[in-house]
């Protein structure tokens, strides 16, 4: 069993993009920014506990940070992990909450 403190640290934020909103509409999939050391099992448990929905599958990828310049200085943004969480049929989760 995964401790509750760990579950709260696994999920960082929803990832809002055009592709993410299309995935939510078509495939009942939510896109989340998660901790880089989070496993698929931890992500599934965290979504299930925090949002009280049934999870079907979890797919993850690591987004590599871009090299950016500020004047002459060259820096690099941090790598981060993204998770595509597909909910089971009949489950619904509305992050954006459009006007009704």
UniProtKB/Swiss-Prot annotation:
One Pfam short name: Ribosomal_L23
Domain of life: Bacteria
Disulphide-bonded residues: none
Subunit note: Part of the 50S ribosomal subunit. Contacts protein L29, and trigger factor when it is bound to the ribosome.
Family from the record: Belongs to the universal ribosomal protein uL23 family.
Sorted UniProt keywords: Ribonucleoprotein, Ribosomal protein, RNA-binding, rRNA-binding
Protein name: Large ribosomal subunit protein uL23
HAMAP family membership: Ribosomal_uL23_B
Lineage of producing organism: Bacteria, Pseudomonadati, Pseudomonadota, Gammaproteobacteria, Enterobacterales
Native organism: Edwardsiella ictaluri (strain 93-146)
Classification via SUPFAM superfamilies: Ribosomal proteins S24e, L23 and L15e (SSF54189)
Protein purpose: One of the early assembly proteins it binds 23S rRNA. One of the proteins that surrounds the polypeptide exit tunnel on the outside of the ribosome. Forms the main docking site for trigger factor binding to the ribosome.
GO biological process, one term: translation
Record GO cellular component, one term: ribosome
GO molecular function: rRNA binding; structural constituent of ribosome
Gene name of this polypeptide: rplW
